[in-house]
């Protein structure tokens, strides 16, 4: 069974926030997944949609799969490097701000007939 894959690396959004969105579309038909993402009011939907569309394009152009029969086999989020910043506080103190990044991976496969 052939599968197409797409990865978005160093996306500047927390992995926890992206996982909330990713959990909604795991195992779904690609067209259903895109519809769910379109109507989900979260900031993470934009990068997830972009990666999913990239995986579909890879399936179509590299493996000549039927885009109507694609399902989201795997979708997961890994933690990328964290950017550390400092926020000045009162009395000469400073707090550390962690700007987290994510790596989003999507694998799509063609659904078998029958």
UniProtKB/Swiss-Prot annotation:
It holds the Pfam family Ribosomal_L22. GO terms for molecular function: rRNA binding; structural constituent of ribosome. Coiled coil: none annotated. GO terms for biological process: translation. CDD domains: Ribosomal_L22. The keyword ATP-binding does not apply. GO terms for cellular component: cytosolic large ribosomal subunit. Keywords: Ribonucleoprotein, Ribosomal protein, RNA-binding, rRNA-binding. The keyword Translocase does not apply. Part of the 50S ribosomal subunit. This protein binds specifically to 23S rRNA; its binding is stimulated by other ribosomal proteins, e.g. L4, L17, and L20. It is important during the early stages of 50S assembly. It makes multiple contacts with different domains of the 23S rRNA in the assembled 50S subunit and ribosome. Belongs to the universal ribosomal protein uL22 family. This is Large ribosomal subunit protein uL22. It comes from Desulfitobacterium hafniense (strain Y51). The lineage of its organism: Bacteria, Bacillati, Bacillota, Clostridia, Eubacteriales.
